[in-house]
Swiss-Prot record:
Its main location: membrane. This is Uncharacterized membrane protein SPD_2301. Keywords: Membrane, Plasmid, Transmembrane, Transmembrane helix. GO terms for cellular component: membrane. The chain crosses the membrane at residues 8-28. It is a single-pass membrane protein. It comes from the Bacteria. It is found in: Membrane.
Amino acid sequence: MYIEGVKIKKIAMFFLGILVGVFIVLFFRNYFVLLLEYIFG
């Protein structure tokens, strides 16, 4: 039972990491676009 809990926790952490990574990429992409518009606009 304990081992199953650890496996579930690892999977949850894995998916959480993916979500955070996607959020960071999207955030920085939007920020980068705004920065480019500010510099070249």
